[in-house]
C-alpha cells in the first residue's frame, strides 16, 4: 500500500516500508495527522492551514478523492432541520463560493437555488420550522405562494401544490474539483 502525504505545501509518496523517497524527505512526525484525502480530510487540512497551523500531514492510501468523494452528488442544500447542520451547510456554501477565486482552481460550484413543494398543510408547517432555523443562521429562505413558484419555475405543474420553500442560494459543486481547490488552498496557506 502506498500513502500520499500532503504537508507543508508538499506532496510526498512513500510505501509501507518508507521506500521510494530519500530518508531525509520522509515526514517522521507532525503536530496533526489527518487520515483520509476526501473532501472532509482535505477540508480539515485547509481550515487548519488557513488558521496558521504549520505542522500538518494528510495521509491518503490512494489519490485525493479516490474514496467516496469522487462519486458524491455534490449537493449544497441550505434546508436543514437542525441549527448545527444548517450552520455547517451555510459555511460550506459560503466557502465554495469564494474558493475558486482564492485558489484560482475551478470548483464547479453553481448556486442555482431550489424549491421544495408543499402538498399539504403539514409541509408548510415544516417549512415554517426550518425557516426559523435558517433565519437564525443567516441563510436566505422564504415560503412562497404558487404564483411565486410560477415566476421562478414556469414549467412546474401546480396541481395539488399549495406553496413551496425557496432557498435561493442552494447549489451544487463538483466534489473532486472542490477538494483539489481546498488542497491547493492548504498548500497556499503554508
Label each region the model flagged.
Residues 8-17:
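Short, positively charged and aromatic/hydrophobic N-terminal segments
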Residues 16-29:
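A short, basic/flexible loop-to-alpha-helix module at the beginning of a structural domain
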Residues 26-38:
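Beta1/beta-strand and adjacent pyrophosphate-binding region of the FAD-binding site
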Residues 41:
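N-terminal Rossmann-fold NAD(P) dinucleotide-binding loop
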Residues 45, 49, 185:
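Gly/Ala-rich phosphate-binding loop of Rossmann-like dinucleotide-binding domains
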Residues 49-69:
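Glycine-rich FAD pyrophosphate-binding loop
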Residues 74-152:
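Dinucleotide-binding Rossmann-like beta1-alpha1 core, especially the glycine-rich loop
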Residues 168-190:
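Helical element adjacent to the flavin cofactor pocket in flavoenzyme catalytic cores
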